[in-house]
Amino acid sequence: NTCSSTALLDECGVCGGDGSSCGGIDYCLDLHSGANLVSFYGLPDDASIANVMSSIEGIATGVIGEGVAANYNGSNWAGSLTIMSPISGYWVKVNDACSLCITDANPTDPSIQFELHSGANLVSFPVDGSVDISSGLPDDIEGSVSGIIGEGVAANNMGDAWQGSLTAFNGGKGYWMITTGSISFAYDVSSMSRIKFEDEVGLTAPDNKEVYQSIQQAFYFIEDVSLDGI
């Protein structure tokens, strides 16, 4: 991926770098009580679920990926999900607000390839930063992505523009990407900002009320509404 007219973004996320600056990175993802749709832009050599989730052991109750899942039984993780992947998104369920911290992680190569099947794919955004949807999806596959669902937000591909409450991909977030066929792509991060977009309108609640995020979500895009003949 290019990051300027003459330079390439290396696997460490450095514009014009030679890949030699990659040291282990430390970062944390802030989680609210309930289900959080996350991804990882760096994972340690030991990417087992027990190691990756060790900072919130006893607070995390389960992790759900696409077609895989694991539950914490009080002493061990059990289930079909055993290794965390930098290209996958995950629902992380916790019983209290906390920070999921990863130490000495290997930064994910920004040009990593995603192989998606037709339908819903639970994917990551593999870089610590933000890019708007249209810029982040290569032109040759953008038309094959009909919609994208995040945690409490969504965007619909209208052909000439994206509409909805989701406006950008953010590092650390997971996304359901809905495709009309099988595609292979890498995100275009040439216009990426290191400042994450926080303008999405997610779940809101009346005063003195709480909203608990569910892993089951539905979104509706309404083209026309007629009320009392208006």
Stretches with model-predicted labels:
Residues 1-25:
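Extracellular calcium-associated, cysteine-rich motifs in secreted modular proteins
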Residues 24-219, 227-230:
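N-terminal exported-region signature
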Residues 222:
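Nucleic-acid-binding surface
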